[in-house]
């Protein structure tokens, strides 16, 4: 294990976090909020620890996959712990576990909250809370790849460890250039959404914070009723952009280089859009009696379907009051998730496709034992290693899900609350059903249960393995 390079990267992450906190400090200055000092204190702490780690450059900059996984997990833990300080120091979330839960929920783009009154927070902390979504959405280490030089294939090893999905695709030969392209697309889409929301009459602060949450598919609102209080136009714009940010960013790159047909022929993107369409139609007909018109039922339904499948977690209505059929579909969408290579969470549509095609292959193999078939997506054969890792991922996912449910059951809440609480955190969604539904929150859980759910949020965002490898002794052995 190359410890020097790990500390070097952590130092960069702390300095980067200090820079990311500066806009929130500016917001505190604009609104003349005294709680801004807590952000300044966190910035100084980041620099105090981060600068010495960066100044001492490692002699060996070789960065293998083992270091990639360990560094990714450690960076996200450090990022979250320091990011929680403004909430604790300001006194708005005095319990460190609660503050950590809120911050991890932000960075992992989960959007689950322990706050009972969001509107009580000052503007600077509301902005920081939403900005953590944007930082974590594309990945803080992906951003770091655009800034620091590393040896050999080190950039790819970092990107593999943090990027969502069963495999990582380079858009261009250089990984550093790929990271820059991804962030450019990310920023442009975010800015477009901000302007469209402003055009609809939404206040500037609201437009920025909600766009940051949409871009990262996070879901932290700045109002107690989430998005319900905004106009239909604004809700439609947010719906569109939730769907857009749930699409594999490779598709946008293909569109930019005028490969429109190749972008549309993506099996994952088409399956993702088909699932949204089918779920929307099914739920709309099921809940049409709950709204004044079919059009309103459709608009509310597609918003919630987009919010859940992209794992954003915004709400315009209390869908926990919908019929069981509709609630069941929404719970299933929690597991499906968005496309790989997007900012969304969940199992990912690409993994679902691989699993379904694996089942199909095995069934045909039973009927025709001598036949040789390979799993294909977009006309290309999927490597056996990708299929194997997908199967292992699902096995580990089920184990973590079941064990987490068992642990939080010690709180003695109902089964639906426990089940959807784990589903909402492990899949990085935010709201669940029952006590953790859109009108509830996670404040009633014990500190122990919150720590379990914090682990789930980090595990879900990092695709399980980077976090689990921290507990494997072989990870920490020197070369």
Language-model features: locations:
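Membrane-proximal intracellular helices of multi-pass ion channels
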Residues: 1-479
């Amino acid at each position: 294990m190359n410890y020097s390079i790990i500390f070097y990267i952590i130092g960069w992450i702390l300095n980067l976090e200090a820079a990311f906190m500066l806009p929130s400090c500016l917001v505190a200055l604009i609104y003349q909020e005294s709680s801004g000092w807590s952000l300044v204190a966190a910035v100084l702490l980041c620099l105090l620890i981060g600068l010495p780690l960066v100044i001492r450059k490692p002699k060996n900059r070789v960065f293998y996959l083992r270091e990639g996984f360990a560094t990714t997990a450690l960076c996200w833990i450090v990022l979250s712990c320091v990011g929680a300080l403004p909430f604790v120091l300001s006194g708005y979330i005095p319990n460190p576990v609660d503050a950590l839960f809120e911050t991890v929920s932000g960075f992992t783009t989960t959007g689950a909250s322990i706050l009972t009154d969001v509107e009580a927070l000052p503007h600077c902390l509301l902005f920081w809370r939403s900005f953590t979504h944007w930082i974590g959405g594309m990945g803080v280490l992906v951003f770091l790849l655009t800034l620091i030089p590393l040896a050999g294939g080190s950039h790819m090893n970092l990107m593999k460890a943090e990027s969502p999905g069963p495999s990582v695709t380079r858009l261009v030969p250089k990984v550093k250039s790929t990271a820059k392209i991804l962030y450019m697309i990310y920023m442009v889409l975010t800015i477009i959404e901000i302007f469209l929301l402003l055009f609809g009459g939404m206040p500037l602060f609201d437009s920025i914070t909600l766009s940051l949450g949409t871009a990262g598919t996070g879901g932290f609102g700045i109002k107690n009723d989430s998005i319900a209080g905004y106009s239909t136009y604004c809700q439609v714009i947010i719906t569109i952009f939730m769907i857009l940010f749930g699409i594999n960013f490779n598709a946008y790159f293909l569109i930019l280089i005028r490969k429109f047909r190749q972008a549309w022929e993506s099996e994952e993107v088409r399956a993702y859009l088909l699932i949204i369409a089918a779920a929307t139609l099914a739920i709309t007909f099921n809940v049409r009696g709950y709204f004044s018109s079919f059009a309103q039922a459709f608009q509310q339904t597609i918003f919630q379907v987009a919010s859940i499948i992209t794992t954003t977690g915004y709400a315009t209505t209390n869908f926990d009051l919908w019929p069981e059929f509709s609630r069941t579909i929404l719970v299933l969408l929690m597991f499906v998730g968005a496309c790989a290579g997007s900012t969304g969470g969940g199992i990912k549509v690409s993994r679902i496709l691989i699993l379904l095609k694996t089942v199909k292959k095995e069934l045909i193999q039973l009927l025709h034992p001598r036949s040789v078939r390979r799993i294909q997506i977009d006309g290309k054969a999927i490597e056996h290693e990708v299929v194997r890792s997908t199967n292992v991922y699902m096995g580990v996912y089920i184990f973590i899900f079941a064990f987490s449910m068992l642990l939080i059951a010690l709180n003695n809440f109902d089964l639906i609350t426990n089940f959807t609480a784990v589903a909402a955190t492990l899949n990085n969604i935010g709201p669940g059903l029952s006590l953790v539904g859109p009108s509830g929150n996670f404040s009633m859980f014990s500190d122990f249960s919150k720590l379990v759910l914090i682990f789930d949020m980090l595990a879900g965002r990092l695709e399980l393995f980077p976090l689990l490898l921290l507990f494997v002794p072989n990870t920490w052995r020197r070369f």
